[in-house]
Every structure is written in structure tokens, then in C-alpha cells.
Amino acid sequence: LCALAEQNAVRNGFGDRVKVVNTDITAPPSLLRAAGLTREGYDQVIANPPFNAEGTVRAAADRARAAAHVIGAEGLSGWVRFLATFAAPKGRLTLIHRAECLAELLSLLDRRFGAISVFPLFPKRDEPATRIIVQGRKGSRAGLRLLPGLVLHEGDGSYTAEAEAVLRGGEALDLGG
């Protein structure tokens, strides 16, 4: 996935401005530095933490795949702590997670990040959001904004025109930032 992210950055003209790092968020600081990470060195930190708690899903046989799907003992707090460590002052954090984890995420971001925007992703019209994209600015005291979000699928399962525009047409999501 890291190679794909790097290829996408190059393809979209950001190859010289994007750094993709494949590391373990629980690694000791010396290993993180060796991987090229700089404390408070990034204007934007982005994460897609695993959504599933250990024991709630059948673990994949492949260790790397299992790690990508099951959050470790560090939980969401470890992910937020990691991202906060590497976000520059006034830098942005962006992550996607389950909608049911919103309260926990807001609590973890409190006093570290402000100007929080919550962008819900709805599987279909008239269904509750199942995923959220949360974005905040490190050190900001600005308040929370709940954005309109995006409906992903029509009743027949096909993508909505808005989702197609993002997924296939390169349209940006308006995260209000």
C-alpha cells in the first residue's frame, strides 16, 4: 500500500512534497527517527487506523493483514498520540474511523487539536453514517463543525454521482479546512 501511495503522489504531482512511511506506531523513538520521521515535522498527518478490536473478528492468517484490520493494545489513543507527536504546530490531522467511535475520538483530540471537522460517510441515503473522516488543527481552540458528509451508494448499490466524482473523477472532499 505504501508503494501505491507513493505512485499516486507522483502521478498527482506531489512526489516531491509527500513522504510515505511504513512503520509501527508502537516502535521506539529511535526506530521512528531511523525511518525518517521528524517530531512535529509535518503539516498534514493522515491515518486509517484498524477498525476492529482484538477478538471481535476472525484474524487473517497473514500477520501483516491481521495487523491492518485489528487495532493493537495501543488503541485509538496510541494512534492519536502518534499523530500528535508528528503533526507540526498548527498542522492538520486527518483520520477515518467508525462513526460509533466519534465520542472517543473527540475526547482523545481534546486539548491537542481544535477546529475539528467531522465529515460523515453514509452507506446509502436515509441510513446512518458508518464511517467518519475527522480533521483537526494542532493547537487550535476553534470549535467543532459537523459537515454534511457524503452518501456513497444508491439504493441499487451503485455509487452516487457525488461519490463517483470523488472516487473516479478526482474531486476533492470538502472537509471545511
Q: Where are the regions a protein language model picked out?
A:
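Conserved SAM/SAH cofactor-binding pocket of Class I
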Residues: 1-58
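Short, structured loop/turn "capping" segments at alpha-beta junctions
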Residues: 16, 53-56, 89-93, 114-117, ...
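Mobile active-site "lid"/loop adjacent to the S-adenosyl-L-methionine
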Residues: 40, 49-78, 82, 86
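Conserved Class I SAM-dependent methyltransferase catalytic core
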Residues: 72-129, 133-134
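SAM/dcSAM-binding transferase cores
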Residues: 128-177
